[in-house]
Amino acid sequence: MASIAHAEQHAALTHHVRQAVTSGRAARMGSLPGTTQLDLAIMLPLRHEGDLDRLLLNFADPAAPGYREPLSVKEFTAGYGPTQQDYDKVSRFAEANNLTIVATSPNRIVLDVRGSAADIEKAFHLSIGVYQHPTENRTFYAPDREPTLDLDVPLWHISGLDNYSRPHPLYKHRPVEANSNPDFSNPSPLTGSGPGRQYLGSDMRAAYYGSGPLDGTGQSVGLFEFLGYELSDVTLYFQTVNQPLNVAVKGVSVKGAKLGCPAKFCDDTEQDLDIVQAISMAPAMTEALVYVGNNDVDIFNQMATDNIAKQLSCSWGWDPVDSNIDDPIFKEFAAQGQNLFAASGDNGAYVGTNKNNDDAWPADDANLVSVGATHLVTQGAGGPWDSEIAWNFSGGGPSPAKLRIPGYQQLAGVINSSNAGSTAYRNAPDVAAEGDFDNFVCSDGSCSGGWAGTSFAAPRWAGFMALINQQAVANGRKPLGFLNPLIYRIGIGSNYDSDFHDIVSGNNTKFNAVVGYDLVDGWGSMNGSNLIDALAGKAK
């Protein structure tokens, strides 16, 4: 886990140097010019984390005090956030080292600063080199040693010291995949209501929920994005499929990030499909909040400190230098009744390759819901669920970063010889939804079919959770928050088969879909009002 620099002079941090640098796999090409401006997010650790962990356990336990009693940002900060005194000391340290404070954070977890490479090297006693990337045709910059600093305040992490891993969206397109894979075959049968029998977002609502009264009223969904989007592509989709768009789409610029396309042309496929899929599942939600930023720490932290959307979705993958970097924020999500769904990746089983590592994070973190993908067949266009098998590109397996297995996966019966899961490390995914090469998308000014990926599954689950929380609120309850402790209890319970569609056929090249939990599609896909009633109580 992340190593905290304790209160002593020249305190050293860990997990800031890339393995490619320490091993020599990345050849050093020179030094980063000292005038280069870098944006850093300095993170402080939580306080009383043991107490917070107990609070989170109680949050999901009906017999415990604090059951489903979410905290406000102010309450979380007062109880578990860094102190104002420590935050101020870090601010003064930054300014004393010629680092400009770009933004502060209400929860005091993140301090955003900007400075020259020369000043950053001096402040943290390191050298930032330029290296040849070992697996990509480009160079990257990174520190050659761990940061040490003259500061009597503990730090959690300093984000932004390297650009080794570039985030990428977790979707695929049939023409591209067919050209590169001789074994590729088109999904069959096709039962969608869109052009070419492709699936529309509304088909997912019909298949996984039905025609009931829940529509997301009063709820918001938050979408995590690294690039901006064009709203015209969203409206193009709904106009093309002849459906109304009654949900406000609101862009949230994180630290000044551009909300629209940064150039005359940009690929906003990921952003558009996230928006469309979430809205289609909950077509009367209050708003879809599209958080656009340049680094994961700032985007996630903005979602937490806004604390508006209780259902969040991330369909991007990257390989962090420290796999625990975002944990303080993920725990704040849970304490505030927010739930993050993360796409599990589109390259099959996690087998330790660089591509798998880029796909697995953040989905293999234990404090969020990892979402795999399936091939769904409905009972005709716009019809109910009929059958479902595993999508063989669905990411899953034990954590490549060897993150410790969480308590909810240690429940009796979850990990067994049939699913071949790990008893030591976090297993992914947790749940799944449709994501085969049979989805219709509008982006970059045009529309086409043949799109796939766990990128579709994650926002579909976020939209579905808006329905769950809508019913919970109508029943006089608070938002459910982090779902995994609840889902896994359902999974080992007597009503599992009625609450989930258990995926028992197919594989992701290493792991098989089996009865119960598996490392291809988790517990499976949502079974409409049955699952909603199990989580939110029957509608009154």
Residue spans of the language-model regions?
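Phosphate/diphosphate-binding glycine-rich loops and adjacent basic-rich segments that engage nucleotide
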Residues: G383-S394
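A short, ordered amphipathic alpha-helix with a cationic face
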Residues: M1, P62-P65, V504-S505
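An often Trp-containing, charged/polar helix-loop segment at the C-terminal end
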Residues: S418-N419, N469-L519
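Predominantly extracellular beta-rich ligand-binding scaffolds that present long acidic/polar faces
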Residues: F333, A342, L368, T378-P384, ...
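Substrate-binding/charge-relay-adjacent region of secreted/lumenal peptidase catalytic domains
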Residues: E8-P106, D112, A117-A373, G395, ...
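Sec/Tat signal peptide C-region and signal peptidase I cleavage site
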Residues: S3-A7
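Short clusters of hydrophobic/aromatic residues that line enzyme substrate/ligand-binding pockets
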Residues: P362, W391, Y408, V441, ...
